[in-house]
Amino acid sequence: NIVDIPPVDGCDLLSTIDVGMQDICEKALTDKLKELNASVGVAVLMEVATGEVKAIVNMTKAGDGNYYEMRNNAISDMLEPGSTFKTASIMVALEDGKITPETEVDTGNGIMMMYGSKMRDHNWHRGGYGKINVTRILEVSSNVGVSYLIDKHYKDNPQKYVDGLKRMSIDQPLHLQISGEGKPNIKGPKERYFAKTTLPWMSIGYETQVPPLNILTFYNAIANNGVMTVSYTHLTLPTT
């Protein structure tokens, strides 16, 4: 027997996506991917005050050389965030009172040996930045500056650094209720393969994995005076 149950009016589910902004982002991303001959790219536009995602584009290069939307890389790809993670590292040290914006680091010629491995700034071949303060370290995205500070102040207690990251919820999923959402992987000192080099390299965005949308949400919270929020959809009551 087939039971036919009539629908009942409920809330309307509305997307936060702005079609015009989506088109602009798609073209901009595709053009840049072609210019760089890149394999995959993501572009997300978020409204600061509400955290609403106004545009989200995920492009992957196919076998025919063209770019297509194949998966939601922005929420599912577990990527090393690289230099975008430096802000979080500096914020932890600032909040713990370990440094101030004027704290200076001698980055030397742009190369610093750390536990037998070379930490390099991007301009090491031009002689590095020499002595610079924390503000300048962030401005020029100095690998040496950030890693030196975090290693200096947390090498005896790496868990305190990890706890600082967790205070900012950077290790938490966004709970978007969308299939395939990835959960950030922030390594702790009690885990396997947490070597002496892990902390300095982790501080500049390596040896850790975070989906792109999570990094955007973190920066959006900074712009939004510390309020972290993200939304793909919202509900509205049905009109009568």
Give each language-model segment a name.
Residues 2-4, 17, 43-78, 82, ...:
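Beta-lactam-recognizing serine transpeptidase/beta-lactamase-like catalytic domain environment
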Residues 236-240:
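A short, hydrophobic C-terminal helix/tail in secreted or cell-surface proteins
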Residues 1-42, 62-65:
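Extracytoplasmic/periplasmic proteins that interact with beta-lactams or build/remodel peptidoglycan
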